[in-house]
């Protein structure tokens, strides 16, 4: 019985290490269930990484007495709040899979630019020791979502909305209070957006493939 969790962890790690099939013609060779499983695992990994980073940054730079008021001020800060994306599991269940994939793609793409500056901000690895790989992880998830869109749209995806607006760059001047608050807000949005993307992918996976892990 003790081998169960270990086996599950090893399987999850193995799936995370699997690359997406790059050639369009080869996508049908990978079952849809595997595409969804890989996408969900990658989204979960990124969301956890973002949550851990936010907490570490908070502990390192934001006084405990100021956190609550700052978090309230950040409520309307995230760009993702300006697009008509579902805000939770219940709303996500009312949308089609293609809609949820498009929202997921928009959320991921909005961070491709800003995260390239993370390694310059956290050069001491105090907060984000793997920051130089976050861009690669986001690109990997982007490819997985695009693969799912091709599968669900019979290999001929319609021209989707192109995200023109994105988040600001992270500020490298950590001696400035304004810069610290800006980075704190960006990390909060990064965490929220990845949580949304993970939720959308899990909703789609669960309603297509009935599983015991669908309660979340």
From Swiss-Prot:
Residues 1-26 form the signal peptide. It holds the Pfam family Hormone_1. Zn(2+) binds at residues 45, 198. Disulfide bonds join 78-189, 206-214. InterPro entries: 4_helix_cytokine-like_core, Somatotropin, Somatotropin/Prolactin, Somatotropin_CS. GO terms for molecular function: growth factor activity; growth hormone receptor binding; hormone activity; metal ion binding. It comes from the Eukaryota. The modification Phosphoserine is found at residue 131. Its main location: secreted. It is found in: Secreted. GO terms for biological process: animal organ development; growth hormone receptor signaling pathway; growth hormone receptor signaling pathway via JAK-STAT; positive regulation of receptor signaling pathway via JAK-STAT; response to nutrient levels. PROSITE patterns: SOMATOTROPIN_1, SOMATOTROPIN_2. GO terms for cellular component: extracellular space. Keywords: Disulfide bond, Hormone, Metal-binding, Phosphoprotein, Secreted, Signal, Zinc. PANTHER family: SOMATOTROPIN, SOMATOTROPIN,PROLACTIN. Belongs to the somatotropin/prolactin family. Plays an important role in growth control. Its major role in stimulating body growth is to stimulate the liver and other tissues to secrete IGF1. It stimulates both the differentiation and proliferation of myoblasts. It also stimulates amino acid uptake and protein synthesis in muscle and other tissues. This is Somatotropin. The lineage of its organism: Eukaryota, Metazoa, Chordata, Craniata, Vertebrata.
